[in-house]
Amino acid sequence: MSEVKLFGSKRGGARLSKHKKKQKTKKPLKVLAIWLCVILCLEGLYFFAVYTNNSFVSYWRSAYINTALSTMRHQWLATKLLPKDVVQAVIDQNAKVTKIMDTDAATTKWDRTDNTADTPQAPDVPDDNHHDLDVNIKPAEPEPLTEEELQAQARAAFFETFWEVDEASMDAYVSEHPEVLANGWENININEAGLDDSGTSITSIYGEQVLAINVPDKVLLLRVTGSGWRGVLAVGKEPAQLSLENSVGLGTYGQTCSEIAERTGGVLSMTASGFIDIDAQGNWGNGNGGILAGYEMSNGYAYGTHYYNYGNNKYKRLELRENDLFYIVDVDAPVDEACTDAMEFQPAMIVDGNVLVSDWWVEKNPRACIGQSDKYEILMLVIEGRGASGSWGTDVNVCAELLKQHGCMQAMNMDGGTSAIMWYDGEEVTRCSNQNLSHGRGLPNAWVYKSITETAATE
C-alpha cells in the first residue's frame, strides 16, 4: 500500500524549512550613532542651561542654585552638578544684594524707652503767709462711676491694647455674641483658631481675619494670606512672657512644639532653632530633632556651638535680654551679659526697622519668623506650605513686609520647612507640611509665650 502524504512531501517540508524568514541583524554602528546624538543633545541642553544669559533660564538657574545651597544636605545638587564659576557667580550676586546683612548696619542698636516714666516735679515751696497754719484739707472724693462709664473705660482699654482690631467689626461681633462680654472687656477670650475652625467675623485694621483674642494673656491671632499661601500671625503683647524652652531630650531627641509649650506653661509657641537632620545610622532626613544646629541660650543656660558660616551666608544670633528686647547680632560677637535667651539661624529680616531684602531665600517654602514691634510686642509668624491647606509657602521677603506692616523693628527667620508650626491654647493652629505629622516634627527647642494668668498663679 502506498504511503499517503496528507500535508505534502518530505521534500516540500524540507524546502519550506530552508526558506524560513531570516532575522535582521542589529547594526551596532547605528545604535551607537543614536546614543551619541542623544548624549550630544543633552550636553548641548546642559551647556545652554548653565551658560545662557537668557533672562528666563538665568532666573530659574539662580533659583535652583539658591535652593540647593540653602539646604543642609542637598548643596551637592549645585556644587557637584554645576561648574564652580557658575555657582560662585550666583553667590557673588547674592552677596551684593545682601551685603547689608554682613555689616554693622545689620546689628540691633535700639533701646527701650519707657514713656510712662515719672516726670521730675519741682519741690514744694512753703508759702510765707501760711507757714504757721496747720490745716488738713481733704481732697474731694470723686463720684463713683456708673456701670456704663466703667464699661466704656474697659472698652477703651481693650482697643488701646489690641490696637490692630477694627472697632466696627469688633462691636458687631459683640452684638451678635453678647456672651463674649459675660465677664467684661478685660476678660474676653475668643478662640476660633483651630484647624477645623473658620475664624471670626472680626477683622484687623489691615483687613486680616481675627482668629483669637485672649485679653487675660494679651494674645491676638490673625489669619494672613497672599498669592498661593496662608498662615497665622500671632501677637504677644507682653514680651516678658517670652522665653526659649528646650526639649527635655536636647542632645538626644526632640519634642513637638506642643509638648514643649504644655510642659513649660505656655499659651503660645512656635518653631525656633534648626537641628542636624540625621539619625543614629547616619541617614539624612530621618533626624529626631534632638541635635541642635548652632548655639542657643535658654533661661540663662547656654547650649551648642556657634555656626560662623553656613551655605555661604553667616548665621545671625537673636538675643532676648533682661530688658525684654530682641537684639540681632553677628554670631562672632560676644554673647551679651544681659542675654537670657538666644538662638542662631539665618537670615536677619528686619534690623532697627530696616527691611533687609534678600535674593537668597526666595523659594516658596513653609516659613517661620519671629520679631518685635515698635510697641515691644512679640510677633510670631508661621506660613504653611508644600500644599498644606492649599498653601505652597512664600519667601522671607514677603514675610518681612508683612511683619513691617505691623510695626516690626527686629525680625529673624527661624527653621522652616517641615519644622514650621505654631501652637496656641492646646492645639496646633497651622498645619505641618508633612500631613502624616499632625503635631509636627520633634524640635530641639521652641519659642514659648507663657500664660500671664498661670504665671501670676504660681508667684
State where each predicted segment sits:
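Gly/Ser/Thr/Pro-rich low-complexity, intrinsically disordered segments
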Residues: 2-459
